A protein has these predicted regions:
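Aromatic- and Gly/Pro-rich donor/ligand-binding loops
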Residues: 1-148, 195
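Donor nucleotide-activated moiety binding/catalytic core segment of transferases
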Residues: 175-183, 187, 235-238, 242-268
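Catalytic donor nucleotide-activated moiety binding site of glycosyltransferases and closely related
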Residues: 126-133, 164-167, 208, 215-253, ...
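A conserved, positively charged/aromatic
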Residues: 147-151, 261
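A donor-sugar binding/catalytic signature common to diverse glycosyltransferases
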Residues: 260-300
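Leloir-type glycosyltransferase catalytic cores
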Residues: 244, 248, 303-349
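A short beta-strand/loop micro-motif in the catalytic core of glycosyltransferases
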Residues: 153-160, 268
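Conserved donor-binding/catalytic core segment of Leloir-type glycosyltransferases
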Residues: 197-210
């Protein structure tokens, strides 16, 4: 959704964005082995042809094909550099979700644009880039290289407030905070662009990246406070479906997930983007935050809107019909959206 929203925002500015398609095949052999073991241990048939993965992600793949402009698959550094040479661009933008997290991005140099020759006159921009964890996991021996690469950027913005001093103190680079790209679009734009169905429900929508008994219990408590039921939507539950049925593991369409938040009475989620879309769609929510790492993205977003009480432990508040001032939140978001859009427009000039 970040790629989709950023492309839409850039199109509104008159640009023709293309997202570089860097397949997961470029992961290390260890990561590929771990993925095969995960699928095997959860009884999902796995084969090297990627048939299983394509089946599970078929709706996501359809969404990408229909809504996101991609480059050809770039399966090596050689292909990436050749594409760069053959397809001149005004600017390259990196962002947003955990693009600078070493554990998730083995070819991390690419995300600092090492493949762009130093003397080339192309605008290098970071939009809402994220380290993913605090403290960051970039190896100390990479500091000098990334400091040099970052100082070739014309503008740097980050998704977490905590990343601003990290960039300054460790890499000598100036940065500012901006909204996650999903929040560059409004509620009405998502409905119109994606044809979402507006059909309000009395249910609590529980969107969990990882499903646990504790999280389901919290969703149940929230639902009981609302005198209603909850509906669980969990990618992890699909990935770990038992019984050997590949069809049971197919992830629902992206639009179904968005409509779940859009039409819910309120939302319980452990996902940053579950919170983001709750705010975009004006829905009360409870955020379940993992305090063992990666919570800075939640903290930045929730504090910007003054909604600290919406973190886990305050679920009883959702029984109030005036959980937060929707108009005030919309005004705050509109201001940050304008500031974030201005950052992009200025950086691209």
């Amino acid at each position: 959704m970040q790629a989709y929203a950023l492309q839409q925002a850039l199109r509104k500015m008159g640009y023709e964005p293309v997202t570089l398609d860097i397949p997961f095949d470029r992961r290390s052999p260890l990561r590929r082995w771990a993925k095969s073991r995960l699928l095997a241990l959860t009884h999902i048939p796995y084969d090297q042809s990627k048939r299983s993965e394509r089946t599970v992600l078929q709706h996501t793949a359809r969404f990408v094909e229909q809504h996101i402009t991609l480059s050809p698959p770039l399966r090596s550094d050689t292909e990436l550099r050749e594409y760069y040479r053959q397809q001149p661009a005004h600017a390259y933008i990196v962002g947003s979700d955990q693009v600078w997290r070493q554990a998730f991005v083995p070819m991390l140099d690419d995300y600092f644009f090492r493949f762009i020759p130093e003397t080339d006159d192309v605008r290098r921009i970071a939009y809402a880039a994220s380290f993913g964890v605090d403290p960051i996991d970039i190896a100390p021996e990479r500091t000098a290289l990334y400091s040099d690469l970052l100082n070739r950027f014309v503008a740097i913005s980050v998704r977490e407030h905590s990343a601003v001093p990290i960039l300054e103190q460790r890499f000598g680079a100036s940065a500012r905070w901006v909204l996650d790209p999903t929040m560059l679009l409004t509620r009405d734009e998502y409905i119109d662009l994606l044809g979402l169905q507006v059909e309000p429900s009395s249910e609590v929508f529980a969107y969990m990246l990882t499903d646990t008994p504790h999280k389901e219990e919290l969703a149940q408590q929230v639902a009981e406070a609302q005198h209603t039921t909850y509906r669980l939507f969990s990618p992890w539950r699909h990935w770990t479906a038992r019984g050997g049925s590949l069809e049971a593991c197919i992830l629902p369409p992206v639009e179904a997930w968005l409509e779940g938040i859009l039409n819910a009475r309120c939302v319980v989620t452990d996902s940053f983007h579950g919170v983001a879309f709750s705010l975009i769609f004006g829905k009360p929510f409870v955020a379940i935050v993992n305090n063992r790492g990666g919570c800075s993205r939640f903290d930045s977003l929730i504090k910007v809107f003054g909604l600290e009480s919406h973190q886990e432990g305050a679920y009883e508040l959702v029984s109030s019909p005036q959980l937060y001032d929707v108009k005030a939140i919309a005004q705050t978001m509109a201001q940050h959206r304008a500031d974030s859009t201005d950052f992009l427009q200025t950086a691209l000039k």
